[in-house]
Amino acid sequence: MDAEFWHSRWAENRIGFHLDDTNPVLTQYWPMVKATRDDRVLVPMCGKSVDLVWLAQKHNNVIGIELSDIAVRSFFAEHLYTPMVTSIGHESVYAFDEITIHCGDYFSVRIDPVDVVYDRAALIAMPKNMREMYVERLLSLVKKGGRILLVTLDYPQEQLNGPPFSVMSDEVRRLFDGCNITLLARDEKDETHPRRKNGLSHFAEETWLIEVA
């Protein structure tokens, strides 16, 4: 993912990927992760997602990583939270109650190991040449026995430029080779879906449970 591209998306408010409500995939499949209240939860490339609030109602330590300071400041402002802000090297850490967001480069922010991960928007934001590096970094942050709830998209990449990019099932299995991988759901969208209306021959959302061995 190009950092300047991401900054410009937020600066120009081109954030069609942002959901105003909690993602139904999260509410439906989070129980499969079997996370306890004290488990440390990581949300990479969290933006200003309201999913953070939902997770914070269930867990004592929810950690986001986000490159855009506009996104981070918007999250806290929109929820009327006043965070404590600490600068550490090239990153800023925003903390309020159960939620901590590291504003900085995903590949270099300093975070203690986590128990569970919710990835709805991070892997699919990565171009193909960055995905192995993204997953390598992610797995380095997850404790042995940790779990990842992963959401990916499957569509003909040649028919639409990303991001979000298509990450097909065989690539998921290759990237997370060595982990226990379970496909929880595949939601094939019909012709009424906006992406299909834009000319895609098919468009599906897949939900995965990745267990780190």
UniProtKB/Swiss-Prot annotation:
It is an enzyme of class 2 (transferase). Keywords: Cytoplasm, Methyltransferase, S-adenosyl-L-methionine, Transferase. Disulfide bonds: none annotated. It comes from the Bacteria. The keyword S-adenosyl-L-methionine applies. GO terms for cellular component: cytoplasm. It is found in: Cytoplasm. Pfam families: TPMT. GO terms for molecular function: thiopurine S-methyltransferase activity. S-adenosyl-L-methionine binds at W10, M45, E66, R120. Its main location: cytoplasm. GO terms for biological process: methylation; response to metal ion. CDD domains: AdoMet_MTases. Its EC number is 2.1.1.67. It catalyses: S-adenosyl-L-methionine + a thiopurine = S-adenosyl-L-homocysteine + a thiopurine S-methylether. Belongs to the class I-like SAM-binding methyltransferase superfamily. TPMT family. This is Thiopurine S-methyltransferase. It comes from Photobacterium profundum (strain SS9). The gene is tpm.
